[in-house]
UniProtKB/Swiss-Prot annotation:
The gene is rpsL. The modification 3-methylthioaspartic acid is found at residue 89. This is Small ribosomal subunit protein uS12. It comes from Bradyrhizobium sp. (strain ORS 278). Keywords: Methylation, Ribonucleoprotein, Ribosomal protein, RNA-binding, rRNA-binding, tRNA-binding. NCBIfam families: rpsL_bact (TIGR00981). Part of the 30S ribosomal subunit. Contacts proteins S8 and S17. May interact with IF1 in the 30S initiation complex. The keyword Signal does not apply. Belongs to the universal ribosomal protein uS12 family. Pfam families: Ribosom_S12_S23. One of its GO terms (cellular component) is small ribosomal subunit. InterPro entries: NA-bd_OB-fold, Ribosomal_uS12, Ribosomal_uS12_bac. With S4 and S5 plays an important role in translational accuracy. Interacts with and stabilizes bases of the 16S rRNA that are involved in tRNA selection in the A site and with the mRNA backbone. Located at the interface of the 30S and 50S subunits, it traverses the body of the 30S subunit contacting proteins on the other side and probably holding the rRNA structure together. The combined cluster of proteins S8, S12 and S17 appears to hold together the shoulder and platform of the 30S subunit.
Length: 123
């Protein structure tokens, strides 16, 4: 337990909370360019080939973004929009790529939750 004089000389430091999405820098979304598009496997007990992309953002950060939905048209040099939101079974993936924005096409034949996947209303 410090003395009063010690506290006057060296006040207590407030612990800063760790940011969950530091690369966004307080923005809701950020734009970036895909540097690598690949698949990766999730942690136990799940099994799949999850589609992810390494993205270089406009602010210089390089992050890994998850590509949601079935099928995608992304390749290297595609311009994408990224939002926060981690994927629980993929370590290091703390961002989602937005579908139907910039170079990313929406999911085909999507009937429900279309706005999440950038799909137009079916006729």
């Amino acid at each position: 337990m410090p003395t009063i004089n010690q506290l006057i000389a060296n006040p207590r430091e407030v612990q800063k909370s760790r940011k969950k999405v530091p690369a966004l820098q307080q923005s809701p979304q950020k734009r970036g360019v895909c540097t690598r598009v690949y698949t990766t496997t999730p942690k136990k007990p799940n099994s799949a080939l999850r589609k992810v992309a390494k993205v270089r953002l406009t602010n210089g950060f390089e992050v890994i973004g998850y590509i949601p939905g079935e099928g995608h048209n992304l390749q290297e040099h595609s311009v994408v929009m990224i939002r926060g939101g981690r994927v629980k079974d993929l370590p290091g993936v703390r961002y989602h790529i937005l579908r139907g924005v910039l170079d990313t096409q929406g999911v085909k034949n999507r009937k429900q939750r279309r706005s999440k996947y950038g799909a137009k209303r079916p006729k």
